[in-house]
Amino acid sequence: MSDLPSVVFGDGPLRWQELVAVARHGARLELSAAAWARIDNARAIVCRIVANGERAYGISTGLGALCDVLLEGEQLAELSRNTLLSHACGVGEPLRDEQTRAIICAAVANYSQGKSGLDRSLVEGLLALLNHGITPQVPAQGSVGYLTHMAHVGIALLGIGEVSYRGSVVPAAAALAAEGLATVRLGAKDGLCLVNGTPCMTGLACLALDDAQRLAQWADVIGAMSFEALRGQLAAFDAEIVALKPHPGMQRVAANLRALLAGSQVLENARGIRTQDALSIRSIPQIHGACRDQLAHAARQIETELNSATDNPLLLGTPEAYRVVSQANPHGESVAMAADLLAIAVAELGGVAERRLDRLVNPLVSGLPAFLVGKPGVNSGMMITQYVAASLAGENRQLAQPAVVDNFVTSALQEDHLSLGTSAALKLGRALENLRRILAIEYLLAAQAFEVLAPQRFGQGTAAAWGILRERVPAYDTDRWLAPDIASAAAILGERKSLARLAASIGDLQ
């Protein structure tokens, strides 16, 4: 599926970037021998419990509010199958393939801890889905934290439901048969293991980290272009001044801005034209930097969850000396809070970008042609793109409202506090897509302002960014259909290669 090297889970701490390599870029996923040994050990504990006829939640009892109902014999496998079927009740549009793949990756990471007790054939089945390009169709809505999304993945292992396969949506059984894969046989606890834990929110949050990290860098680049187009006063980014407020993110952003703007004749010619700039351009290090610090915090929280055992119950010890512990590790409060916090940062990045681009089209403050076009009146220019950005920024303010505090009660009072972590991760993904489009609009407007200010020399990095955009989007001379221009700019912001080219132009981009 990919030329990337295989990713191996199980021999050490996982990085969120490894999950992204598999889910988004198609790297093959494997488990280490040590991980398989842990999985087999936990399964042996389950088999011992069943053989001894012991009472253990989810192994020999019903689930949730039915935890006091004792089961035995064939009922144990029947419970696992029924768990998947009854929990596969999500609604709405299906997740994108990369989102479902991320969830499966996070589930495999959870099982690699060797504390769940599912049969190794299920883990092999999940790896086969990833490595053979078979992606279950998983409805996006219906999770208060976990359960429904992985149930839809689980039924695909049974040959039930639909999957994305070779560019089409087909029956799961047909895709498995086409790849020579058998359906799985379920035993005690297998169904519960598949639906339990925090893989849904964690996998989705890892993708969000990838998007947020890339867009935070682009925000610095595009913010620098707007700063230059508005002839900002570079003294605000002075290294000695910035060091007096030693937040790590702020230091990185200011260093980026100085590198991007180095050699700018535009800024040299504009030195001293005003005492100080508007806050939306003067405080880029402070605003972007604070957002980067929240991103760093969220990454630590999400990566810790990726390296956690989040099933219930968890199995400790060996088949000869074991403990079965009911606890609350599937509660995803840490990921939910991290995703909510990051959504606030994303809303701030988009909000300040909208303020900057509004200044670019406003002749009262920009010193540029009204709406960045000749013959205003006949041409509306970039006027309505600012409306679009304002709409997206407004939506992101709504998406910044925390999901984690919206608690409900489920399962007849047994589950009476819920994280809403999957909802938090999904709305974060929507906010990031809005941010990408806001930044794309700012990119278009700043580049158009450069057309006005040329042939003055621009900064080393900002000139490179201008050139990258102009490879796909021509200058705006008269009114034309703008939606494709926004889409083209947004596509650039989604690419790793364009950002790498830009970073190379200045030596590094933090």
Please name every model-derived segment.
Residues 54, 69, 253-254:
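Polyanion/phosphate-binding surface patch
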Residues 35-36, 63-67, 115, 143-144, ...:
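Conserved short loop/turn motifs at secondary-structure junctions
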Residues 57-79, 86-109, 137-160, 168-169, ...:
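FAD-binding core of FAD-dependent oxidoreductases
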Residues 2-53, 80-138:
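Glycine-rich, flexible loop motifs
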Residues 2-27, 31-38, 42-50, 76, ...:
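C-terminal auxiliary extensions adjacent to catalytic cores
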